[in-house]
C-alpha cells in the first residue's frame, strides 16, 4: 500500500496578502480590490490583544450596495468579519477543505506560529491544486 502524499496549505496559499486598516473607507477598499484583483482583504489588528478581520467582496455587495448605503461614508470595520477563522501553513489541504465546508468559508488567512499573517488560502486555490494533481 502506497503512502499518500500530503499537500500543505503553504503549497497552495497566496503570499501576496493585502492588509488594510479598519478605518479605511469601503470605497477605498473597493479601489484596492479592483487594482489588485483581490477578492479578500485582511484587516489589521489594532493592538496586540486584537484579532485580524477580513473583508470580502460579498460583504460589500450584501451590506453596502444591496442596502443602498454610500461606500464613501462607511468604514471597513462596520462590515468586515471579525474574528476570522485562520489556518496554519502546515495544515493538510484536505482538512482545510473540510474546515471550509463545515464553517461555510471561502477564504482564510494563513497565520504562522508568531501570529503573523503570511498568506491567504481560498476554496479556489484548493480546488485548482486538487484538479491539477488528480486528488
Q: What kind of region is each of these model predictions?
A:
Residues 1-135:
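Tandem CBS (Cystathionine beta-synthase) repeat/Bateman regulatory domains
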Amino acid at each position: 500500500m502506497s503512502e499518500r502524499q500530503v499537500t500543505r496549505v503553504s503549497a497552495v496559499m497566496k503570499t501576496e496578502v493585502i492588509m488594510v486598516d479598519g478605518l479605511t473607507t469601503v470605497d477605498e477598499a473597493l479601489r484596492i480590490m479592483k487594482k489588485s484583483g483581490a477578492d479578500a482583504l485582511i484587516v489589521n489588528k489594532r493592538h496586540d490583544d486584537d484579532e485580524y478581520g477580513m473583508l470580502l467582496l460579498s460583504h460589500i455587495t450584501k451590506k453596502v450596495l444591496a442596502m443602498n448605503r454610500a461606500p464613501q461614508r462607511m468604514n471597513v470595520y462596520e462590515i468586515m468579519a471579525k474574528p476570522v477563522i485562520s489556518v496554519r501553513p502546515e495544515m493538510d489541504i484536505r482538512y482545510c477543505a473540510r474546515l471550509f465546508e463545515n464553517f461555510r468559508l471561502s477564504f482564510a488567512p494563513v497565520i504562522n506560529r508568531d501570529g503573523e499573517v503570511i498568506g491567504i488560502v481560498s476554496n479556489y486555490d484548493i480546488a485548482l491544486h486538487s484538479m491539477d494533481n488528480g486528488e
